[in-house]
């Protein structure tokens, strides 16, 4: 059974690779390479997979899942300039893809139980742009 919990956070970032020239960054990332950055109101969907516990009837305690998402993602990333305030984005380009991978890394170890595991991280950068990440294959 799949269970999905939503959360949102606002953050700013700039997409630029320090090993590339200004011209290369602008060609690659366009306006997203503006050194002053820009922001998004991200929507995060965290999906876990498991069987309902025979005693509780729940796959996972929803309050605990919310607390984990807040502690690992929302609290450290909300209203932050990712490049300057949230490792590893001081040395990794904070694309939506890379942010989704980092969120996975932060959550995977916190959700791993004998019969429950993290299935997918979906991160919306805008209403019509999102990334799905299901861990390394």
Set out the residue ranges of the language-model regions.
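Charge-rich, low-complexity N-terminal segments
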Residues: 1-137
């Amino acid at each position: 059974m799949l269970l999905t919990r939503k959360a949102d956070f606002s953050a700013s970032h700039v997409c630029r690779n320090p090993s590339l020239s200004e011209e290369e960054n602008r060609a690659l990332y366009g306006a997203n390479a503006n050194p002053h950055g820009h922001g998004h109101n991200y929507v995060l969907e965290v999906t876990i997979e498991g069987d309902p516990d025979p005693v509780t009837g729940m796959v996972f305690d929803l309050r605990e899942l919310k607390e984990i998402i807040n502690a690992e993602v929302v609290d450290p990333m909300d209203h932050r300039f990712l490049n300057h305030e949230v490792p590893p984005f001081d040395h990794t380009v904070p694309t939506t893809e890379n942010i989704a991978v980092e969120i996975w890394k932060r959550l995977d170890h916190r959700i791993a139980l004998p019969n429950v595991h993290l299935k997918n991280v979906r991160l919306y950068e805008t209403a019509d742009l999102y990334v799905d990440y299901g861990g390394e294959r």
